[in-house]
Amino acid sequence: MEKNQNPNTWSDLPLDLLNLVFKRLSFANFRQAKSVCSSWYSASKQSVPKNQIPWLMLFPKDKNNNKNSSCTIFFNPEDKDQLYQTQDLGVEFAKSVCLATYGSWLLMQDSKYNLYILNPFTYEKIGLPAIESQQVGMVKVDQTIDDDFLTFDDHNHVKLFKGNNTVRTPVFWIDEKTKEYIALWGLGYWCVVYAKNGDKLWNQIPEIILDSLDMVYKDHKLYSFSYRNLFTILDFSGEIPRKAFQCFMHVYRSEWLSPRSRQLSNSWCVAETKLVVTVTGDVLLVERMLRHWSRIQSFNVYKFYSSGTFLDKYELADSLGDEAMLLDLGITVLANEVEGLHRNTIYFSDSHDTTTKDLFLFNYETREMEPLHKFDFDCSLLELSARWFLPSFSHT
């Protein structure tokens, strides 16, 4: 039988076909495929990995003693044998704290408490107005020589905030292509402020939201609930925010026991109360429960807002269905659309005294914590701050 003198090879696959292949690959498989040959590498430049499983960022806990400026580690649960580490992002990044994430972008606060948005994969950086640069409104802010902040309301009431306690419940959104963005945070207990592209000052939202216990920004809407038991939805689709919904709600908040009682007690405490917006737009109230002595955690999930209606009686959810909850982001995603993502599971990070041994998922069906992964790297990085995020990737 005569041999085919012109056999087709992997390198000869049409570009259109390669593009279809690349669009279906996860991040780990995408990285492997682009290294097959030069033609595949060229084709990969016209594609990006599909929207995938959430990643976990691991930051050193002690920023003051962090002399390694390239120490942030990324863990992809889909590719458990591989840890990714950023290149040198500079001393400023090493001394900064991550406050929130959106896509591949991080909202950071540096050692002088200045805010900026950073993409650790492309190294793009967007500066934000200084905290004390506030639009004339109900609150005035001055920075002290110790980098703390004095706030004055319109009745001349004064309150001192330590620098790292001034920015509360921060959230942001950014368009990956146009870099249009909005950043929002609670100014102490006074009000909520926001800034968009080109703003030199933070805009105060007068009287609508006076303080914030937690906030979620999704689909140009800000969801907030406050220490005053107010649940509010603000619509940011126009030039100025518009109140779309507001009502009183009951939030159970348990005060921490005294240090001595805390050591002796192993009863459940409400360690954190969070808002979560589902795929369909329902709003959930999530209580993270903690047995302090044993460090065992559990979660209660309540539905209290659905289809534009506030539910007088909160419904305790017995299941998350086919969705997975990303508690750090305040959202749920469909697990069956993301390979490797577990349905009916809560992905969370504990910002207090976290080590690699304390990273778990919570299976809402079995009501049990499951270890995320057995990490194996330099013990100098074991004291960590961890945060989940949903990266998206450009043509790199």
From Swiss-Prot:
SUPFAM superfamilies on file: F-box domain (SSF81383)
Gene3D superfamilies assigned to the protein according to its UniProt record, in alphabetical order: 1.20.1280.50
Superkingdom classification of source: Eukaryota
Domain F-box: 7-58
InterPro entries: F-box-like_dom_sf, F-box_BR-signaling, F-box_dom, KIB1-4_b-propeller
Name of protein: Putative F-box protein At4g22660
